[in-house]
């Protein structure tokens, strides 16, 4: 902080400091010649909306009230730091805001003041950076009244410097630890609770951190000022003695209690006089542990600690010595035991203690020779004063010894190159009764204020002169006259008059005070002084303060009686001699230095030290006197604003220009605002920084009267101009963010489209492996005992499960889910089907329903129209655990029943996806599903009444099963042992462009055509020509949907026929009707005589028509002559192969091979007649009539469709006579697949 003393010309290389090279070169006001090294602008992602103004120089109106309003606004939003140029203003929040964490600390490392919000870490960073960069000693002056947060600010500066100063050496780290340990140690001995502050510093401290040439701390030195030793012997109500007395008496270990007789603070006069023993929120025992730990870190040995606590114990017990008047009116000590214990602690003779406290030795002198010696008894008042003087002297010297011991441990371990000083001294004090202590404190604050004004004004004037800027001087209050009023000897000031009074009337304090009042009359002509009866007023910069004269001369003498010096000199304790090293010189007649002399000398030494360093300033403000968070007393703060001179500081800083910055830094901040200095966020200016700054101001239309160009800096006149520049910069980022968002959204769309393509390709490659596994499991569920439909065995068939989307959100599936009350059950399977419904007075009839299988229930859902509204409801809910078995036939029909055995009838249902339903139900029951497969279906039509539905196979019947009169008529299916065909491979097509986006060119973000699209297509294979006996089935023309594809890709892949309204290709003709299928025939090999009425007698050599085949060794045959049907052993027959049909356009489908082996074996020898079948249908003498056409019914795929090639799987011819029909269907399917591939359907999912 402060005003940099950086050289204008030349270049000074820094050595390994924390900032990046770009920041250092740009931000230091130094140019390396030619084009400046400008760091690329970045958006401040952590930048918050500014509350008020962060720099008071940017206020539009400069007044104390405006400053107060801005500080209040920021305080209410937890913004406690505000700048005045390089000066930091801090308002005490009286609570933890979480702004001193390691993360916050790291955010300020290596950052310029303008890059981050105001903070005490920014002050520390600036001081450390300037020290390393320019080898200048730095100092941070913290000022403000008691309780404003000065000590906290000093600790945070030490925290920051210890963190960023580097150094991995163990000695460097030990030095850091010791420096940080000085805080709790000196606070316990030097701080106390006052009415205005619970941790008020009752001494001044100047900590000087010493660094080597690498910026690593190698040592430190502490100078203490103005310890308030009078607090040791007396405090006002609700205040406390120094913290250490309460820490020691409350938490002393048993060793010290035994050695020194330590008791609770209520037992001692010096700690109980004010009746205040505790501080809200402070744990004295924990603080004492921190104090002991700090002593250990400093290196204080255990014997040294014992001696320190021995002296503290002696002070406490000295305060308990009481005096009474004897018969002669002199002071006497009634309780000798306390005197004896004090003598034990000081290691002196008790008689000497008694004598030193009650008798004063007077000596007369004549003509320069020693005269007579008299022992003058003291009265009780005088004895109490002597007692308190001894206690204060011991504590004062003990505090000095602790500081010296700390300095001894912090002695520099290496060569000291530079230093950073931190001044923490209690601020300006105004009480109801102000005495000598307040005069000294306020005097030192006047000296610090004088430094602040002189250096601030001087630095401002020097900068304007150096930069050749025209400005108007600002009037301000120079407090040098107040300092002279207090410290001057000619004419005599307050201190000189006080010393003269002490020397003239030294024997009687009352007479000395009266003499002092008389001397003050000579100062009445000074405009900053007023003399009143018994008091005088000094007009300080912080306000008028009235000081009481009474007792001021005694405090100024500040000398220990020779009797007490002789007492401590007689001690056998070496530590006591260390505290009082000066021997009593009986012959020295010179006046010893007074307290005012000492404070004057200390203040001048401090000023001389600060003047040799580059200063930084922190002005602390106390928002209220109640130490309450979030309370802002405008009157109190306004008073502090006035006496701290913040308004004058703002005026001096403004001086006509609210903002100034080096050319390099200005260009780095605002180069985005000019098209000649930036392009797409990059710095493009090739000239020097000064011309770049001029160009930016020109392109942003800033009037000439609003700025001036100096030698190395640009000066902006009003804060509104700076706000306009910052607003334009923010708008640039806003526009850039919109462009980035647009590009990012386009990129995301590109990624999503690519992901969809990859997923689609993966699904095509894998073909839904999990679904295939479930499909293959379905073959095992049927146990190879039930004929299969040909469409069920397609390689593309998948067991998708939830066909109706019951588990989906939205759409019809959600309507069904809500209407059926499925709730949170997991849906395993859903499709449409039929349930056999019995109606009174009518025959049973299939009725459409919806089947839903969940992990717990099987639900039959009905859809009804009620008052013109579709109502969906669960007609029946069956727990899956209640399903005892499933009954189905061994033919290819889709009917089955659930045997439940409940009070309700078992449902008889028709579902085209029966096998898939059985599979999911078996998995839900963990494989415990019992499936009964026979030539009929059993179910309980009524509770306890078992009904049977026969299933018969009729040749030539349609692919749609029909139900009539408890009989299901179906056609022949694939053999029960059939399995699914392999998954068909898709036809390779040309690759499409990667994206259809408008911002991205085809081929992806990099542009260019897709590489896949450039691959040559495989040569198109000729279609096999049909035989002459069959009309060819023309291939339908595929009309692909248009896609955005590059011209090159289209040309490289394939050519397309242009389609238009006038040039549309004619539709393909309908397929030729297939010839009537031939009936399967069998030749009789052996004679067979029927044994039952349902068997057919045959003779060798006859031809019989095969009606149906059973897997149990019996065939149902019909005599073509008599048209009689019956059961015939399969081994007695040889099936005659039908003549092959003409070759279809597509590859003919292979038919199942006949059992030629069995036939050949039968031809060799006639086997024994097989055993009669276990159960045969009663068909003796009955002619099998073809079933009537069935009414259309609903199904999962298309329950209303009778198309034999539909998804129901019911249009598959099974006999050899239907081979031509199979060929036609195969050709139609092949053409449909080619059309689908030609359209490049991206949404085809199995």
Swiss-Prot record:
Main subcellular localisation: cytoplasm
Annotated PROSITE patterns: MYOSIN_MOTOR, SH3, TH1
Any single biological process term in GO: actin cortical patch assembly
Domain IQ: 734-754, 755-780
Residue ranges of domain SH3 in the record: 1077-1138
Family statement drawn from the similarity comment of this UniProt entry: Belongs to the TRAFAC class myosin-kinesin ATPase superfamily. Myosin family.
Protein name as catalogued: Myosin-1
């Amino acid at each position: 902080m402060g005003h940099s003393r950086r050289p204008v010309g030349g270049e000074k290389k820094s050595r390994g400091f924390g900032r990046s090279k770009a920041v250092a070169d740009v931000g230091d006001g130094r140019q390396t010649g030619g084009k400046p090294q400008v760091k690329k602008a970045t958006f401040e992602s952590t930048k918050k909306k500014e509350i008020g103004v962060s720099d008071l120089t940017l206020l539009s109106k400069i007044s104390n009230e405006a400053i107060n309003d801005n500080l209040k606004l920021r305080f209410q939003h937890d913004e406690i730091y505000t700048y005045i140029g390089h000066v930091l203003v801090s308002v005490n929040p009286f609570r933890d805001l979480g702004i001193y964490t390691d993360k916050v600390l790291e955010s300020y490392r290596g950052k310029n003041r303008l890059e981050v919000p105001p903070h005490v870490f920014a002050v520390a960073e600036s001081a450390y950076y300037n020290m390393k960069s320019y080898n200048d000693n730095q100092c941070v002056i913290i000022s403000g009244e008691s309780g404003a947060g000065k000590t906290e600010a000093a600790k945070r500066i030490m925290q920051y410097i210890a963190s960023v100063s580097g150094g991995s050496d163990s000695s460097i780290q030990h030095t850091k630890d010791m420096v940080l340990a000085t805080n709790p140690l000196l606070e316990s001995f030097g701080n106390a609770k006052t009415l205005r502050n619970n941790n008020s510093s009752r001494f001044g401290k100047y900590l000087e951190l010493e660094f080597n040439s690498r910026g690593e701390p190698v040592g430190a030195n502490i100078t203490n000022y103005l310890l308030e030793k009078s607090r040791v012997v007396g405090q006002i109500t609700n205040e406390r003695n120094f913290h250490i007395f309460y820490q020691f008496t409350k938490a002393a270990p048993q060793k010290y209690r035994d050695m020194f007789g330590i008791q609770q603070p209520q037992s001692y006069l010096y700690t109980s006089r004010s009746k205040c023993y505790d501080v809200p929120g402070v744990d004295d025992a924990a603080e004492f542990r921190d104090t002991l730990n700090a002593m250990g870190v400093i290196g204080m040995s255990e014997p040294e600690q014992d001696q320190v606590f021995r002296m503290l114990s002696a002070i406490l017990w000295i305060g308990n010595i009481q005096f009474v008047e004897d018969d002669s009116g002199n002071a006497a000590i009634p309780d000798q035991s306390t005197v004896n214990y004090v003598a034990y602690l000081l290691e002196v003779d008790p008689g000497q203690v008694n004598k030193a406290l009650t008798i004063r030795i007077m000596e007369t002198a004549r003509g320069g020779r020693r005269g007579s010696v008299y022992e003058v008894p003291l009265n009780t008042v005088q004895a109490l004063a002597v007692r308190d003087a001894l206690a204060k002297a011991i504590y004062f010297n003990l505090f000095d010894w602790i500081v010296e011991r700390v300095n001894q441990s912090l002695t520099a371990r290496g060569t000291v190159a530079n230093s950073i000083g931190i001044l923490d001294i209690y601020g300006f004090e105004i009480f109801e009764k102000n005495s000598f202590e307040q005069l000294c404190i306020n005097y030192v604050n006047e000296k610090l204020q004088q430094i602040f004004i002189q250096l601030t004004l001087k630095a401002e004037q020097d900068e304007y002169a150096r930069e050749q800027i025209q400005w108007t001087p600002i009037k301000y209050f120079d407090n040098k006259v107040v300092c002279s009023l207090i410290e001057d000897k000619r004419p005599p000031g307050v201190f000189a008059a006080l010393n003269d009074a002490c020397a003239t009337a030294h024997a009687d304090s009352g007479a000395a005070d009266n003499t002092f009042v008389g001397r003050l009359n000579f100062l009445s002509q000074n405009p900053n002084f007023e003399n009143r009866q018994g008091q005088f007023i000094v007009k300080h910069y912080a306000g008028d303060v009235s000081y009481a004269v009474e007792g001021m001369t005694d405090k100024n003498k500040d000398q220990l009686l020779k009797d007490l010096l002789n007492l401590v000199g007689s001690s056998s304790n070496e530590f006591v001699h260390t505290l009082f090293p000066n021997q009593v010189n009986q012959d020295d007649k010179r006046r010893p230095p007074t307290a005012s002399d000492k404070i004057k000398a200390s203040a001048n030494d401090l000023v001389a030290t600060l003047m040799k360093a580059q200063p930084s300033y922190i002005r602390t403000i106390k928002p209220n006197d109640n130490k309450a968070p979030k309370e802002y007393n405008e009157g109190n703060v306004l008073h502090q604003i006035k006496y701290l001179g913040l308004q004058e500081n703002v005026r001096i800083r403004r001086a006509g220009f609210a903002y100034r910055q080096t050319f390099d830094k200005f260009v780095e901040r605002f180069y985005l605002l000019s098209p000649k200095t930036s392009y797409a966020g990059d710095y493009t200016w090739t000239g020097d920084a000064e011309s770049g700054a001029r160009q930016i101001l020109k392109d942003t239309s800033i009037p000439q009267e609003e700025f001036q160009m100096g030698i190395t800096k640009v000066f902006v006149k009003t804060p509104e101009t700076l706000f306009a520049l910052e607003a334009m910069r923010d708008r640039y980022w806003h526009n850039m963010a919109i462009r980035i968002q647009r590009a990012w959204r386009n990129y995301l769309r590109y990624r999503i489209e690519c992901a969809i393509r990859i997923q689609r390709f993966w699904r095509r490659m894998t073909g839904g492996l999990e679904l295939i596994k479930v499909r293959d499991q379905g073959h095992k569920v049927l146990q190879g005992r039930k004929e299969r439909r040909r469409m069920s065995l397609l390689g593309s068939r998948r067991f998708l499960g939830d066909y109706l989307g019951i588990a989906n959100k939205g759409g019809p599936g959600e309507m069904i889910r809500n209407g059926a009350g499925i709730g949170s059950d997991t849906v395993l399977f859903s499709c449409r089907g039929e349930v056999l419904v019995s109606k009174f007075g009518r025959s049973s009839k299939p009725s459409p329903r919806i089947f839903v299988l969940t992990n717990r229930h099987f639900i039959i859902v009905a859809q009804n129209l009620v008052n013109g509204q579709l109502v969906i409801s669960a007609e029946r809910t069956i727990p899956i655990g209640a399903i005892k078995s499933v009954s189905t036939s061994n033919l290819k029909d889709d009917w089955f029943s659930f045997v439940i055995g409940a009070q309700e009838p078992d449902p008889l249902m028709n579902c085209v996806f029966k096998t898939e339903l059985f599979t999911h139900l078996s998995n839900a029951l963990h494989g415990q599903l019992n499936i009964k497969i026979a030539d009929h279906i059993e179910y309980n039509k009524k509770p306890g009444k078992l009904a049977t539905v026969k299933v018969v196979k009729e040749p030539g019947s349609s692919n749609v099963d029909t139900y009539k009169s408890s009989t299901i008529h179906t056609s022949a299916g694939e053999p029960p042992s059939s399995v699914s065909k392999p998954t068909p491979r898709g036809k390779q097509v040309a690759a499409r462009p990667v994206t259809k986006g408008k911002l991205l060119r085809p081929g992806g973000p990099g542009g260019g055509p897709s590489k896949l699209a450039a691959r040559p297509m495989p040569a198109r294979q000729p279609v096999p020509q049909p035989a002459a006996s069959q009309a060819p089935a023309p291939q339908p023309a595929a009309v692909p949907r248009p896609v955005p594809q590059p011209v090159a890709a289209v040309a490289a892949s394939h050519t397309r026929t242009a389609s238009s309204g006038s040039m549309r290709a004619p539709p393909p003709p309908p397929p030729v009707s297939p010839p009537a299928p031939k009936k399967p025939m069998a030749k009789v090999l052996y004679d067979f005589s029927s044994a039952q009425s349902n068997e057919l007698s045959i003779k060798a050599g006859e031809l019989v028509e095969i009606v149906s085949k059973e897997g149990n060794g019996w065939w149902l045959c019909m005599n073509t002559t008599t048209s009689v049907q019956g059961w015939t052993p399969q081994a007695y027959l040889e099936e005659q192969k039908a003549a092959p049909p003409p070759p279809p356009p597509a590859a003919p489908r292979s038919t199942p091979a006949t059992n030629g082996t069995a036939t050949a074996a039968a031809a060799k020898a006639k086997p024994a007649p097989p055993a009669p079948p276990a159960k045969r249908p009663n068909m003796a003498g009955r002619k099998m009539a073809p079933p009537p056409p069935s009414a259309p019914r609903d199904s999962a795929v298309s329950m209303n469709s009778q198309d034999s090639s539909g998804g129901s799987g019911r249009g598959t011819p099974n006999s050899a006579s239907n081979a031509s029909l199979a060929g036609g269907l195969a050709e139609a399917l092949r053409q449909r697949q080619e059309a689908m591939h030609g359209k490049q359907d991206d949404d085809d999912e199995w």
